[in-house]
């Protein structure tokens, strides 16, 4: 991944205010990267901060899956996902799939403000970084043949 990161910004409804506040506090750093997000979250961040945030669909309308596809296509390097651990979501299976893809493709994920702070302030944010993607095709061949 390049020094200019492609960052996805995602938040469940009860966590949107926290993500917007975090983006406001970190807008200078975020402005140096390409940003995208799920529908409402992207719109609210753009309105609050003036940052350009490419909007995918809303999470329950397929936005989580769109972000997952973008990760697979190497169009997203990094994800800030403030999720609500106390409320069941109608699209929980999509969220689980998004997290699985994020781990599979070795992208950094922050799911709370503390982790987001650690990641965004890391010296690696300004550098190129090599992902360590597990070759599952090799594993499948080895286990089955």
Curated annotation (Swiss-Prot):
Q: Which reactions is this enzyme annotated as catalysing? A: dihydroxyacetone phosphate = methylglyoxal + phosphate
GO BP terms: methylglyoxal biosynthetic process
Q: Which residues form the MGS-like domain?
A: 1-145
Q: What is its EC number?
A: 4.2.3.3
Protein keywords? Lyase
Any one annotated GO CC term? cytosol
Please list the residues that make up the active site: 64 (proton donor/acceptor)
Residues annotated as binding substrate are 12, 16, 38-41, 58-59, 91
The reply to whether tRNA processing figures as a keyword in the UniProt entry is no
**Its Gene Ontology molecular function terms?**
methylglyoxal synthase activity
Give the matching Pfam families. Answer: MGS (PF02142)
Q: Which domain of life is it from?
A: Bacteria
HAMAP family assigned: Methylglyoxal_synth
Q: What does this protein do?
A: Catalyzes the formation of methylglyoxal from dihydroxyacetone phosphate.
Family of the protein in this entry: Belongs to the methylglyoxal synthase family.
Q: Which PANTHER family match?
A: METHYLGLYOXAL SYNTHASE
Q: Quote the protein name from its UniProt record.
A: Methylglyoxal synthase
- Write down the species: Clostridium acetobutylicum (strain ATCC 824 / DSM 792 / JCM 1419 / IAM 19013 / LMG 5710 / NBRC 13948 / NRRL B-527 / VKM B-1787 / 2291 / W)
């Amino acid at each position: 991944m390049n020094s200019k990161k492609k960052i996805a910004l995602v938040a469940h409804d009860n966590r949107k205010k926290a993500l917007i506040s975090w983006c406001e506090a970190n807008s200078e750093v975020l402005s140096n990267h390409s940003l995208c997000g799920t529908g409402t979250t992207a719109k609210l961040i753009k309105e609050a901060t003036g940052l350009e945030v490419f909007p995918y669909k809303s999470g329950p309308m397929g936005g989580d899956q769109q972000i997952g596809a973008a990760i697979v296509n190497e169009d997203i390097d990094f994800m800030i996902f403030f999720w609500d651990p106390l409320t069941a979501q109608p699209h929980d299976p999509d969220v689980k799939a998004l997290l699985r893809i994020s781990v599979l493709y070795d992208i950094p994920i922050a799911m709370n403000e503390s982790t987001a702070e650690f990641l965004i302030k890391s010296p690696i944010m300004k550098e190129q970084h090599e992902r360590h993607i597990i070759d599952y095709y090799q594993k499948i061949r080895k286990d089955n043949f």
